Design a protein with these regions (language model features):
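Conserved catalytic cores of phosphodiester-cleaving nucleases, focusing on short active-site segments
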Residues: 35-37, 44-56, 74
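Active-site-adjacent loop/helix micro-motif of nuclease/hydrolase catalytic cores
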Residues: 55-68, 95-98
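N-terminal targeting/trafficking signals and adjacent low-complexity tails
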Residues: 89, 97, 127, 135-136
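Acidic-basic catalytic patches of nuclease active cores, encompassing PD-(D/E)XK
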Residues: 1-31, 38-43, 78
Length: 138
C-alpha cells in the first residue's frame, strides 16, 4: 500500500467528518507535514504524517516510529489555535502504534492514529481507544 493511497483515503475520511477548510497536502517528496486541514466550523487544525506499507518484516515498526518522530518534530506550541496531530498508517503499522504508543502521551499531545485498510477504509483512534486496547492486553 503506497503512501499516496493512505493519504488520499484519510483526506476522504476527514472531509466526511467536517474537516476540509484550507486543506493542504504535500507530494511524496515535499517538506513538512503530509496533511494539514482545518475544521469547517472551528479554529482547529489536524496535522497528519502518513506512511505507506513497507516490504520487509520490520518495515511496519519502522513506519510507525519514523512517522511518530516526524509528527513530533512538527508540533507547534503556544498561540490560540488548537492543533491536533495524527499518524496516518496502513493497518499493520497502526496495530503496532495501538500497542506501543502510550495513551497518556497521545492524550497530552492530542495525537490520533488513523488506520487505513487495503480498501481505503479509515478508522480513527483517540487516546481513549489506545487506553482500552492497552488495558485489554494487561
Amino acid at each position: 500500500m503506497k503512501e499516496e493511497f493512505v493519504k488520499s483515503s484519510i483526506i476522504k475520511y476527514l472531509s466526511r467528518k467536517e474537516w476540509g477548510t484550507n486543506l493542504q497536502f504535500g507530494a511524496l517528496h515535499d517538506r513538512g507535514v503530509d496533511i494539514k486541514v482545518r475544521h469547517n466550523r472551528y479554529a482547529r487544525y489536524f496535522l497528519i504524517e502518513c506512511k505507506g506499507q513497507g516490504i520487509g518484516r520490520g518495515s511496519n515498526e519502522v513506519a510507525f516510529v519514523y512517522s511518530l518522530g516526524q509528527v513530533i518534530s512538527r508540533m507547534k506550541t503556544g498561540g490560540t489555535t488548537r492543533y491536533y496531530y495524527g499518524l496516518g498508517l496502513p493497518e499493520k503499522s497502526a496495530k503496532i502504534a495501538l500497542r506501543r504508543l502510550p495513551w497518556q502521551v497521545a492524550k497530552k499531545l492530542l495525537l490520533y492514529v488513523f488506520s487505513c485498510d487495503e480498501k481505503g477504509n479509515v478508522r480513527q483512534y483517540s487516546w481513549q481507544d489506545l487506553k482500552k486496547a492497552q488495558d485489554f492486553k494487561k
